[in-house]
């Protein structure tokens, strides 16, 4: 019987998690930061924010981009509900575009056709979320062309595709998309039990992602120097979307054998 979401855990994984559990800090510590660095290098992105799960990643992105009632976001109908829910949670409207029959990814030619014909939609599209379904990269060159032409933010829901190649490049995602989201649920290529990540080359986005990950906290270094290390401000409504250190330790260990895990899945 083939399990829906059977994780692959080896002795190294157990060893690294055990080490993390013996540390003084097991919540969000330096292992989380190390995992972010490893993911950034793997996907050739400047910035990474790891979070509690892939759905949290999408919701943080949606809140960062400030979608609202009159906005539309183009996306695929073939995905887990979190992809469209992040749009609805912000009060915006998901507009489903059909998929390519061979790759099951968003069909950019249909995107172009819809935007050409529908001026109402064209004026209100704020973003496009494409899922690299079952590890198959979308036609990112064409999608990037469309995002530049019609001025919308391009988001890669890369939860199925960590380690995939586009034009023979595993770091393709950040070359084309403005923002990339990942999931580390057991059904994905690597797991942290639950977990997710957001990657970008935008420093402005990254600052917002990290703030929203932790209750909307804002830390001004000048004020911290004046008032003390514990001084912080909360400037917008959010919640706790943090990953803990022993999850991050598992993620680092799993990432080291990503290629082996992908080969195992292909069998």
State where each predicted segment sits.
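Phosphate-binding glycine-rich loop
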Residues: 25-72, 86-88, 95-98, 120
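Active-site phosphate-binding strand-loop segment of PLP-dependent enzymes
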Residues: 102-192, 197-205
């Amino acid at each position: 019987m083939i399990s829906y979401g059977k994780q692959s855990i080896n002795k190294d994984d157990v060893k690294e998690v055990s080490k993390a559990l013996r540390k003084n800090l097991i919540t969000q510590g330096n292992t989380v930061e190390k995992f972010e660095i490893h993911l950034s290098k793997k996907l050739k992105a400047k910035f990474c924010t790891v979070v509690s799960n892939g759905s949290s990643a999408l919701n943080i992105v949606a809140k960062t981009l400030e979608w609202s009632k009159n906005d539309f976001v183009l996306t695929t109908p073939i995905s887990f509900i979190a992809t469209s829910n992040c749009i609805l949670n912000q009060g915006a409207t998901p507009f489903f575009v059909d998929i390519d029959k061979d790759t099951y990814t968003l069909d950019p030619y249909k995107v172009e056709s819809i935007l050409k014909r529908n001026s109402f939609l064209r004026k209100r599209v704020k973003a496009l979320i494409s899922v690299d379904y079952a590890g198959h990269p979308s036609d990112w060159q064409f999608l990037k062309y469309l995002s530049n032409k019609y001025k919308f933010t391009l988001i890669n829901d890369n939860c199925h595709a960590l380690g995939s190649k586009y034009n023979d490049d595993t770091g393709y995602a950040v070359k084309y998309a403005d923002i990339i989201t990942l999931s580390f649920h057991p059904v994905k290529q690597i797991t942290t039990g639950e977990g997710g990540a957001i990657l970008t080359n935008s420093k402005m986005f990254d600052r917002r992602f990290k703030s929203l990950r932790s209750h909307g906290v804002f830390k001004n270094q000048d004020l911290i120097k004046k008032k003390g290390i514990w001084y912080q401000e909360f400037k917008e409504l959010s919640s706790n979307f943090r990953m803990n250190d022993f999850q991050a330790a598992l993620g680092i260990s799993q990432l080291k054998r990503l290629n082996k895990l992908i080969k195992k899945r292909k069998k």
